[in-house]
Amino acid sequence: MGEKWKRQQKLCNVPHIPRIRVPRSASDTPLLKDLTQGQQRYFYSIMRIYSPRPQWEALQARYLHSLQHQQLLGYITQREASACAAVLRDSTKRASAKAGPHRTVPQRAAGRTRTQPSARPVCVIPLRARSTRLPSLRSRAVHKL
């Protein structure tokens, strides 16, 4: 019984390796048919390195942080920040739903390729009237004259 506990304890410390998501357009190409499974995994790992998804997630996080910062400074209201964040979340959900479920390396079946590009979230922050906190350079120059 002690051996089983030690074995389970060792498994908890093993780092989790994320699965490689393979788009249908890449998995169904005739070029990959002649490759072995190891070569395909290597190719998919290279595809993962050049994947735009981590950059896209970082951009989303940066945008949300920017919204929070603008709200703290008083440039936008809580309602405006929440509305823009909701638009970002909804458009991200729509884009991931449009792309369909991603397949992993072990699965291999014929499928169709996607014909439409995935949607990118768009949120326009409405400009508010000038803030009373930060006067513009133009108003400073007028006061000096």
UniProtKB/Swiss-Prot annotation:
Name of this protein: Protein FAM216B
Organism the protein comes from: Bos taurus
Taxonomic classification: Eukaryota, Metazoa, Chordata, Craniata, Vertebrata
Disordered as annotated region, ranges: 92-121
Family of this protein: Belongs to the FAM216 family.
Pfam families: FAM216B
